[in-house]
Amino acid sequence: EPYWGGEVYLDEIRYIDTGEDDSAAIAALASGQVDAIYRLGIPTLEIAERIPGVVVSQAVTAQTGVIRMNVNNAPFDNKKVRQAMVMASDNAQNLKLAHRGMGSVGENHHVAEIHPEYAKLPPLKRDVAKAKALLAEAGFPDGVQVTCNVGNTDGTWEQDSVQVLKENAAEAGIDITINVMPSAQYWEVWNKAPFSLTSWTHRPLGTMVLSLAYRSGVPWNESGYNNPEFDAELDKAESILDVTKRKEQMAVVEKILQDDAVMVQPFFRSVFTAAKDNVKGYQTHPTRYHQFNSVWLA
């Protein structure tokens, strides 16, 4: 049967596996072995931009790295410890250093500015002195030591992001040991470890990821967060069709999650790809889907 999407221009599409190393894909693009690549990471972005005849494209997304704390594991079962971690983080600095500023600053509630129901809350303020005071109130006047797992499952920016948090948190007396794991090994423990960075993909609605990741008892609730009030307010948001009214309700939802300090979520990141300049109509998709229905070769 004819393709439902109308006329297409390519006769054939071939995928070549260059392995997990982004530099191998860049080399294949530069040499002409391939016409385009699947993804372009931050470490290879500048290289691609300098290759003659190569065009880099970018998509603004809700993809993000969530440095979440499991609320059922010590010391994160103490809300004040979680609040201290959040208060010590400089999310804007994290975006700048870990992702070249390519994205938007996160607000620790996993809803992005590009989501239609996003509600703007008062800006977060870093307060190292307050973070220290919270630790003392939680029973850690001399600071606390924790280990954060990272698998670099979507690139080394994950490790860089945790490194920035480590340096921020040290000022407040929080000593973070970074446990870098193979990506396959990370996915074996991602929803079990007390403290980890997990890369979450883009979803078109903010309510979607909140239901997947923070609703009580759902399989992907890696933080172990369990708050009936949050669940009820999220139910209300999901029941509202009018976007303007849903924004008002989402302000309540976002604030609950932010106040409970479940995560440090430094930024939402832009994603990139690259292609030869004779490849027309090839664009980066927020979820990295390949859509070749309007791609053609000049």
Residue spans of the language-model regions?
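Short, solvent-exposed loop/beta-turn-alpha elements that line the ligand-binding surface or hinge
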Residues: 2-11, 46-59, 68-79, 112-130, ...
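Short, hydrophobic alpha-helical packing/hinge segments within bilobed ligand-binding/sensory domains
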Residues: 24-26, 34, 44-45, 81-82, ...
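Append "and occasionally in soluble cytosolic enzymes with long acidic Gly/Pro-rich linkers
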Residues: 50, 57, 77-167, 226-229, ...
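Periplasmic binding protein-like
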Residues: 36-39, 161, 166-215, 249-250
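Ligand-site clamp/hinge motif
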Residues: 1-47, 166, 175-177
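Structural recognition of the beta-strand scaffold that forms the well-ordered cores
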Residues: 14-17, 35-39, 56-58, 65-68, ...
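Bilobed periplasmic-binding protein-like "clamshell/Venus-flytrap" ligand-binding domains
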Residues: 137-155, 198-201, 241-277
